[in-house]
Amino acid sequence: MKNIEKLEQSLTYEFKDKNLLIHALTHKSFKKSYNNERLEFLGDAVLDLVVGEYLFHKFTKDAEGDLSKLRAALVNEKSFAKIANSLNLGDFIFMSVAEENNGGKEKPSILSDALEAIIGAIHLEAGFEFAKTIALRLMEKNFPQIDAKILIKDYKTKLQEITQGKIGQTPQYETVRAFGPDHLKQFEIALMLDGKELARAIAGSKKEAQQMAAKIALEKLGSLQ
């Protein structure tokens, strides 16, 4: 049995039903008939509402579109995996030996899902307000400065607006290569403009690499802004 008391201390919440916490920590590779997918589904809905309400009250002058972008920047696999790592959540997840040997304890998707499942479990046992309090504490601890300008890093859209407006061209993103093991896959993206390479970036997802390449391109095209 894993020392889940340490996890409870980090969460600042002690489960009355320990089996519920174990359920939230059980990956489908460990036991297909008893895993955390349903709790993950619930936790995802809870977190979506918690963060949405938080942003609604924090950014009182922002339009719906900006609030949606802010929520998307916080409610995602990367952000949840960061929070999960702050809890050392990988140490507590039950998974098959094969999955563990494949780097399962470091996979952002597994960590993110487990965090959502835990929030779902807290909601089931203690109610929405308890889940909300814990979720916000974890969010603010890992993202102490929730700034709209920092979070909404949609460099691709900004670059496209500039290039279309100034030179009538739309940037193209080409995958140069994908490399590394499955759980640490990296993607190299080349940003092409008018048939010429303008920037190149490497990241853990195509989307992130494209955003990084767009940011580099924006810096190069600073005179167009």
UniProtKB/Swiss-Prot annotation:
Reactions the enzyme catalyzes: Endonucleolytic cleavage to 5'-phosphomonoester
One Pfam family it belongs to: Ribonucleas_3_3
Every RNase III domain range: 4-127
Gene3D superfamilies per UniProt: 3.30.160.20, Ribonuclease III domain
Keywords recorded for this protein, A-Z: Cytoplasm, Endonuclease, Hydrolase, Magnesium, Metal-binding, mRNA processing, Nuclease, RNA-binding, rRNA processing, rRNA-binding, tRNA processing
Presence of the UniProt keyword Lipid metabolism in the record: no
Residues of the DRBM domain: 154-223
Sequence positions that bind Mg(2+): 40, 113, 116
Cellular component aspect of the GO annotation: cytoplasm
Compartments (UniProt record): Cytoplasm
Cofactor: Mg(2+)
Family: Belongs to the ribonuclease III family.
Function: Digests double-stranded RNA. Involved in the processing of primary rRNA transcript to yield the immediate precursors to the large and small rRNAs (23S and 16S). Processes some mRNAs, and tRNAs when they are encoded in the rRNA operon. Processes pre-crRNA and tracrRNA of type II CRISPR loci if present in the organism.
Database matches in PANTHER family: RIBONUCLEASE 3 (PTHR11207:SF0), RIBONUCLEASE III (PTHR11207)
HAMAP family found in the cross-reference section: RNase_III
Quaternary assembly: Homodimer.
Protein name as it appears in the record: Ribonuclease 3
Taxonomic lineage: Bacteria, Pseudomonadati, Campylobacterota, Epsilonproteobacteria, Campylobacterales
